[in-house]
Amino acid sequence: MKTLEKKHPLAIRWFHWINFPVLLIMVWSGLLIYWANPVYRIGVGKHTLMKMTVKEPVYEKWHIAFRLGEGISLHFFFMWFFAINGIAYVLYTIFSGEWRYLVPDRRSFKESFLVVLHDLRLRKEAPPQRKYNAAQRISYSAIILMGLGSLLTGLAIYKPVQFAWLTWLFGGYQMARFFHFWITVGYVLFFVVHIAQVIKTGWSNFRAMIIGVEVGEARGD
């Protein structure tokens, strides 16, 4: 006999599915902006400690043209959707009590190691599973912090004069760009792992993020 278990509230599902295309557009438009100046410099004053750049063949292979204006327009337009959706998600999570399922507790870091071993088939026994497992709680909470980092570094880059104090906190304009870039790389890596986990866990888990309930098997007496 099949059972239905409530999994994700409607608001959480809306935030999730709004953020998905918006973040993809933000990453793509960010690549268009980055292509205009792919050099990152880390230094103190005029002294350069490190330079990093993505070589042109990468962009040539992906057929990314010089479309700086288009990239800036898309990035600055969709950043408002990204920011508003993210802030609304955090506020909802706090006031609805959903944070209790999301924020890691003192057991999460130990249990997350068990989750990784189980996913790699190095451990047969399934780790403790609540609404989110320990690895999910850590990674989803990290994504929220990364979102905050994106907004703050983005402001430091977008308005380095008006938010000079913020740009200074990140170590200057180039360092803010550097952090912004690597946070974006983190999003891409998270996205790859997230999709792989969705495929691994199957249709029922994916469907729960659409309709809000998970279909399971009733336990016998």
Language-model features: locations:
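Membrane-embedded alpha-helical bundles that constitute the cytochrome b-like, heme-associated redox core
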Residues: 1-221
